[in-house]
């Protein structure tokens, strides 16, 4: 087919991504920052059924970000049981790059220019530090900026290193 680069599903571990790269020789472009879907990548039908737009075709209606009341009341405590925290891998960049990831993908669709600019600037800074082969620690000010431009009750490292279960869920924020 002539493919040179693939974007693997966000649910894969770093070991699985490395295995695909080793087996195929293809470049890997991986999501490192942005929204995570409650469903497996490409398998969300909730957006189509409840929102009338296909999340599998880049038109997610964000139905997993709506409040759902599991106890039959409109109790707002934990009203967002399907809302995952956003992915933030800034502290795991060396491991991600060491596992053969060639290109980093930052969510920008339907985001403002401040979000895209700040997130890109911060990731660029730490990619450059990694490439300079100097050890570094992510500065608290940079983490604060990432939290301020957008988050859903904190961040998660996603599936790259381990499955985090309920720690990946926001519950209180859409």
Summary of predicted features, one role per range:
Residues 3-174:
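Surface-exposed amphipathic alpha-helical tracts and adjacent flexible/coil segments at the periphery
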């Amino acid at each position: 087919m002539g493919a040179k680069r693939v974007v693997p599903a966000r649910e894969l571990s770093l070991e699985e991504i490395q295995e695909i790269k080793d087996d195929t020789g293809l470049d890997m472009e991986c999501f490192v920052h942005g929204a995570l879907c409650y469903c497996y990548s490409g398998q969300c039908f909730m957006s189509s059924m409840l929102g009338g737009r296909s999340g599998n075709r880049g038109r997610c209606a964000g139905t997993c970000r709506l409040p759902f009341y599991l106890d039959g009341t409109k109790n707002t405590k934990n009203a967002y049981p399907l809302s995952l925290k956003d992915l933030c891998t800034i502290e795991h960049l060396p491991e991600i790059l060491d596992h053969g990831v060639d290109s980093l993908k930052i969510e920008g669709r339907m985001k403002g220019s401040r979000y895209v600019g700040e997130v890109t600037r911060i990731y660029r800074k730490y990619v450059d530090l990694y490439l300079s082969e100097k050890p570094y620690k992510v500065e608290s000010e940079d983490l604060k900026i990432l939290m301020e431009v957008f988050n859903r009750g904190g961040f998660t490292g996603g599936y790259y290193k381990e499955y985090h279960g309920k720690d990946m869920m926001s519950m209180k924020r859409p």
